[in-house]
Amino acid sequence: MSGRLQSSLSYCVQQVRNYDYHHYLCLLELPPNMRKSAFALRAFNIETSRAMDIASDPRIGLMRLLWWQESIDKIFSNKLIEHPVAQALSSVISEHKVSKTWLKRSVEARINDARRDDSDIPQTVQELERYAEDTVSTLLYSTLESGGIRSTAADHAASHVGKASGLALLLRSLPYHAGRNGRFPYVPADVAGRHVLDSREGLCGAVFEMASVANAHLEKARGLAGTVPAEARRVLLPGVPAEVLLETLRRVQFDVFDPRLSRGILGVPPLWFQMKLKWYSWRGRY
């Protein structure tokens, strides 16, 4: 491995550690031969998921996403791109059969989301489920592919884990978005119509409804565990942080503004989270 590529991969690992720590711990449970791909893919997700949040102007964030959309095409055409995550992805794609479809679908979902007006909220929970599928489940599909795991059952479980994780993380992000524009862009209209979002009780009711959908996906994923190949189960360990976050939401009565949500790792002590993750990994669960 060249020094340049090693530097790019180290950058990916550090980005995941800095900005997605609970998933960083999940990736450490993967077999060594899968970690390179997994960290590169997760770093790509960080680049696209943070593009709008770190931009001083939404137009700059959108330009960044469009750049990544174009970069995926270039990577699959074996063109060199001067960006550490792109270089790591290029190496992964040259060594493994990773579908371009999943990467494109992920960044295109982010682009479509970035182009929404503040007042243009999703109409149904199903729309948010599709967004979670497109941005989170696709990441798990790509990781399975990079590990040479071809299993319909694993893909099916990954779909549900991704939806559970994606929905839970959208709920966690609600205070951030409310602080930026005073709105809750990830509470769909059909849910908002059943609750009064400008009251604490109403918002908690909406969060409970959406958290219940996320939990149902997690239960469906775990119901498939008996058919999922053993080598795929560690790829699905993001089900653990999803469960932890949903459980923390339950403990704070689904109040996303409760400061306990930001303590430790997803609201629990770091050592407890790591022990739970290790236990699930050792038992072949997710």
Over which residues does each language-model region extend?
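Catalytic cores of Mg2+-dependent Asp-rich isoprenoid enzymes
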Residues: 1-91, 103-110, 132-141, 154-167, ...
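A contiguous catalytic/ligand-binding core that recognizes phosphate-bearing ligands
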Residues: 147-150, 161
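Short, flexible active-site loops
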Residues: 122, 145-148, 195-200
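Hydrophobic alpha-helical segments and helix pairs
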Residues: 95-142, 146
